[in-house]
Amino acid sequence: MTPLPRRQAVSIFLVFAFAYFISTLIRAVTATLAPTLVTEFSLNARDLGLLAGGYFFGFALTQLPLGTWLDRFGPKRVILGFLGIAVVGAFAFAQASSFQWLLASRVLCGVGVSACLMAPLTGYRRWLAPENLMRANSWMLMVGALGMVASTLPVQWIVSVAGWRPLFIALSAMVALAMVLIYLQVPHWHAAPTSVSSQSTASRGYGEVWRNPYFRKMPPLGFFNYGGMVAMQT
């Protein structure tokens, strides 16, 4: 497919980057809010760990079917559907009155932002020139890192001025704004005939990946290295 004009490609990158920035901010924000949540809800270390893990549980639930959905429905439809869940999750977190409510809201947030990186990367393969792909992918990761940075001192300042509940209402509104921008800027996806696969075909594909000897060496690295890193960050 012919790459999109430069101006349109930049617009698409910016709206996707905005959504990914918010998603990583939401991911890491509980670490900054931990003292406040401990005081207000009488949480212990286990509860804080569950809040962080709840996000990743929701995130992980969608990853296997996500690739099939992206190929079949396209980045625009998939990310809009998921971000709608993130809006609900962030708003529900702001209204929480118990630990169970907080945890359920974090799971919804994890589900809701779980396509914020893979949907753009899928679209970039079709919409950007090949020589710009690596640059766009690396810039997306940089924007995600900035989102985690924004969850530290900036969030501490906002919480001291307005409180953590208004913060999550604002995050919910920002996700809704990202949805509007994506709806307006991102083109529709015309699936290629070969991209529509049945569930059984997708399952066989996952099986082939799992049986690959090289792949089976990778999960321990991800579990201990990346898992340890995000545990420290969240």
Which residues are covered by each model-predicted region?
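Extracytoplasmic gate region of multi-pass secondary transporters
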Residues: 30-31, 214-234
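Conserved MFS/SLC helix-loop-helix module at the cytosolic interface between two early adjacent transmembrane helices
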Residues: 61-97
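Juxtamembrane intracellular "pre-TM" segments in multi-pass secondary transporters
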Residues: 1-5, 189-219
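Helix-loop-helix hairpin linking two adjacent transmembrane segments in secondary transporters
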Residues: 139-187
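Paired small-residue
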Residues: 89, 100-108
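Extracytoplasmic
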Residues: 11-45, 232-234
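Residue-level signature of mid-helix packing/kink "hotspots" within the transmembrane helices
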Residues: 28, 56-64, 148-149
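Cytoplasmic helix-loop-helix junction between adjacent transmembrane helices
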Residues: 105-143
